[in-house]
Amino acid sequence: MMNEHSIDTDNRKANNALYLFIIIGLIPLLCIFVVYYKTPDALLLRKIATSTENLPSITSSYNPLMTKVMDIYCKTAPFLALILYILTFKIRKLINNTDRNTVLRSCLLSPLVYAAIVYLFCFRNFELTTAGRPVRLMATNDATLLLFYIGLYSIIFFTTYITLFTPVTAFKLLKKRQ
């Protein structure tokens, strides 16, 4: 049986890895923004956008090149979350017990919520300038577009990571009860 201090230490290590991975994951978005800001007609960005033009994406007609490349990069968030999951699988420990109904509900509902999020953000075309007022206002400024894509990447990353841990957590909780 592990004591509380070692559980806290292990979870702190897993959380530090989580913070490091999300920062590493967001750096390319900042690089895309800087490259576009310095040279709006950058060959690298154009090449990425044209080679992925058939993929569905969330773009803004105000800035189609930068938003296309940022959206394509946001589609890589599940892969980085999977790598993090593999690295922190044995480190992260459970803190408290929950009842069996909550565990089963989370096992059934979290994949459905994740599937809806991934479908909406990764497999549909969406024009930001035709959305509701707050999003439409964000879509007309490069800095707010960067914030939008940072949020999008973070949402996809964290929901993937949480969804990957749900069955493991359920298994550990149910195993602990027996």
From Swiss-Prot:
InterPro entries: Colicin_im. The chain crosses the membrane at residues 14-37, 69-89, 106-123, 143-165. GO terms for molecular function: toxic substance binding. GO terms for biological process: bacteriocin immunity. Residues 38-68, 124-142 are periplasmic. One of its GO terms (cellular component) is plasma membrane. Its main location: membrane. The keyword Calcium does not apply. Keywords: Bacteriocin immunity, Cell inner membrane, Cell membrane, Membrane, Plasmid, Transmembrane, Transmembrane helix. It is found in: Cell inner membrane. It holds the Pfam family Colicin_im. It is a multi-pass membrane protein. The keyword NAD does not apply. Residues 1-13, 90-105, 166-178 are cytoplasmic. This protein is able to protect a cell, which harbors the plasmid ColA encoding colicin A, against colicin A. This is Colicin-A immunity protein. It comes from Citrobacter freundii. The lineage of its organism: Bacteria, Pseudomonadati, Pseudomonadota, Gammaproteobacteria, Enterobacterales.
